[in-house]
Regions:
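Short helix-perturbing small/polar motifs within transmembrane alpha-helices
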Residues: 1-27, 87-130
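Hydrophobic transmembrane alpha-helices
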Residues: 2-57, 61-62
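Interfacial aromatic-anchored transmembrane helix boundaries in multi-pass membrane proteins
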Residues: 27-43, 70-100, 130-137
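Residue-level micro-sites within transmembrane alpha helices that shape
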Residues: 44-47, 91, 121, 149
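Hydrophobic transmembrane alpha-helices of multi-pass small-molecule transporters
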Residues: 49-52, 75, 97, 126, ...
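Membrane-helix interface "capping/anchor" motifs
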Residues: 55-67, 104-111
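Membrane-embedded alpha-helical hairpins and interfacial helices in multi-pass inner-membrane proteins
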Residues: 82-87, 102-173
Length: 173
């Protein structure tokens, strides 16, 4: 019996490691994909996309690990985002994961939990942009087209996580 539990744990660890590797690879390749597609990939928030997939399909610890590592990996491989912005994004993504689990524990509603956690963590992020950067930078980050794309992405991410968690596709936390 002990062997079966260990094997199951190893399988989940392998799944988390493979997912983490794929997420990091996607983030490293995102600038090249944006160039090839001639489309601003950041509109779909690649780091948050990886975070949503991690929340849906891997253990909680993996979502936190990706929230903490994806901005750093992006910085190390591409120099973007700059250091202060990287730290803000790291805090935002980590807060996003924490808020999701906190709200979900209170409501048991996946869609509302992820939707609110994304919105609240974005508000936190934009507040820090105002503190650490100029008003002009803040305004460039909150252009109408970008905000609309974020609202669409947030809705799609929330719908996906709702679907995955309610169709037994998610990892049992």
């Amino acid at each position: 019996m002990k062997h079966i539990v260990t094997l199951s744990g190893s399988k989940e660890l392998l799944k988390s490691l493979l997912f983490g590797f794929a997420a990091i690879l996607f983030i490293v390749l995102a600038p090249a994909l944006a160039h090839l597609a001639n489309f601003p990939i950041y509109y779909i928030e690649p780091m948050r996309l990886m975070l949503i997939l991690a929340l849906a399909h891997t253990p909680k610890a993996n979502a936190y690990a990706l929230a903490l590592s994806l901005p750093l990996v992006s910085f190390l491989f591409s120099g973007h985002p700059e250091v202060v912005k990287m730290l803000i994004i790291t805090a935002e993504l980590t807060l996003n994961v924490w808020l999701f689990y906190f709200i979900f524990k209170k409501t048991s509603r996946t869609f509302i939990s992820i939707f609110l956690s994304i919105i609240l963590s974005k508000m936190f992020c934009y507040s820090l942009y105002l503190v650490f950067f100029s008003w002009a930078f803040f305004m460039s980050e909150t252009q109408t087209v970008f905000l609309i794309s974020q609202l669409i992405a947030t809705t799609l991410f929330s719908a996906y996580l709702y679907w995955a968690m309610n169709h037994k596709l998610s990892f049992k936390k």
